[in-house]
Amino acid sequence: ARLLARNGYKKMTVDDLAREVGIGKGSIYLHFSSKEEIALSHIDRLVDRVKERLRSIAERDAPLEKRLHDMLIERVMIRFDNVQHYSKSLNEILGYLRPQLLERRKRYFGEEAKILAMVIAEAQASGLFAKGDALDLAQTLIVATNSLLPYSLSAIELGDREEVTDRTHKTANLLIDGLRVR
């Protein structure tokens, strides 16, 4: 991540990465076929952390609305916080990885939606949320909060954590209000 921040994606080489972590270039190629694969692996690990955190919140002993609210906030803010050190090169990285990333995003978001759907279904069963397809509703929440993810923000917005946090809270509140039984 430091190397990305310093050199940008285009200028970063596998040689640079090997030097940075103190191993031979060959050792890197034992695990990864290219720097693209290394970057995608980094993104995969970030999404794994997001899903772990969502599961942890889903299992908490807290009101259902609070759990869902916190899950929506976390899925945005974990990503925001993780790209801060290379936010200037984020567009460059995404430009190079776009085709591969688009394939993975569908899977990432589908997996996150399944976790959200568990809480939505529980809230529906308790009479708190209106009936409906919990997974479809979860996918709608994912799509609605995706506009707050780092790749959707401008460089200026990426620098303002307070603004992104505030906007994410407002969005989560609005979305959850739309799920309530009337």
Task: Briefly describe each language-model feature range.
Residues 3-37, 41, 45:
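Helix-turn-helix
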Residues 49, 71-82, 126, 144-151, ...:
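Phosphate/oxyanion-binding loops and surfaces in catalytic or ligand/nucleic-acid-binding neighborhoods
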Residues 39, 43, 47, 98, ...:
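Amphipathic, non-transmembrane alpha-helical scaffold segments
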Residues 41, 45, 55-82, 137-141, ...:
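Hydrophobic alpha-helical connector segments
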Residues 70, 74-115, 135-136:
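Short secondary-structure transition hinges
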Residues 6-10, 61, 82, 126:
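Short coil/turn segments at alpha/beta junctions that flank glycine-rich nucleotide-binding fingerprints
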Residues 87-91, 102, 124-171, 182:
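Hydrophobic/aromatic-rich alpha-helical bundle segments in the mid-to-C-terminal region
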Residues 119, 174-178:
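C-terminal alpha-helix
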